[in-house]
Amino acid sequence: MNPLFTQERRIFHKKLLDGNILATNNRGVVSNADGSNTRSFNIAKGIADLLHSETVSERLPGQTSGNAFEAICSEFVQSAFEKLQHIRPGDWNVKQVGSRNRLEIARYQQYAHLTALAKAAEENPELAAALGSDYTITPDIIVTRNLIADAEINRNEFLVDENIATYASLRAGNGNMPLLHASISCKWTIRSDRAQNARSEGLNLVRNRKGRLPHIVVVTAEPTPSRISSIALGTGEIDCVYHFALYELEQILQSLNYEDALDLFYIMVNGKRLKDISDLPLDLAV
């Protein structure tokens, strides 16, 4: 019998395959490959073969693939993370945000002040010009935690009343908003400046928060280690990059004998900058 997280990982891959998000076109190019780059072509094909990708007449448009990848990542996080209630109990929510609401995170406690900032910028063009877009942060997926009522806090012992711990972030009785636990950026591929904006958004999350910093992570299906490293290497902006098929990526790099790419792969893995998608739920439980 396989562990549940192995099953969740297989379901995640099956959804990508069944939806033709990960697919091979009739020219042999896999949907997450750069067809003009030989290494990208070969690595992506190797991973797709291991995951049993089928041939389709044409790949999905880039934006469609990206949105679908976000949705499937969100479903994976939701399903896997809820199995960790015994490790990380709480009233959790996982939500796909996308680019629909540039102030979605202002609904949560650490970033509630951004609403007032946005309003002030709206009313003052000079302030808007000075601020730029540094305060607008649009995660693809968020994990949030609802606050705890005093009755639950006091369930085993009488810990708090209206005169103590009156500013505690986790306490519902203090009139606080829910907490942002994690910001997840999904990048189907990493081939443009826009794809690499995950680092700048991560830095904005660090700079603009009041209170506890949420987890800041990136999930990608990019096949080439060199492009993954453009986001993964370095520290400060993001916790870690999670690859949709890390084990398969390692296997293909070994079989293709891409030694320099494999060296970079191990630098990222051993440096705790790159992990598998199956590691994400447990890391979110920290």
Curated annotation (Swiss-Prot):
The lineage of its organism: Bacteria, Pseudomonadati, Pseudomonadota, Betaproteobacteria, Neisseriales. The gene is ngoMIVR. This is Type II restriction enzyme NgoMIV. The keyword Mitochondrion does not apply. Mg(2+) 1 binds at D140, C186. GO terms for biological process: DNA restriction-modification system. The keyword RNA-binding does not apply. InterPro entries: NgoMIV, NgoMIV_sf, Restrct_endonuc-II-like. It holds the Pfam family NgoMIV_restric.
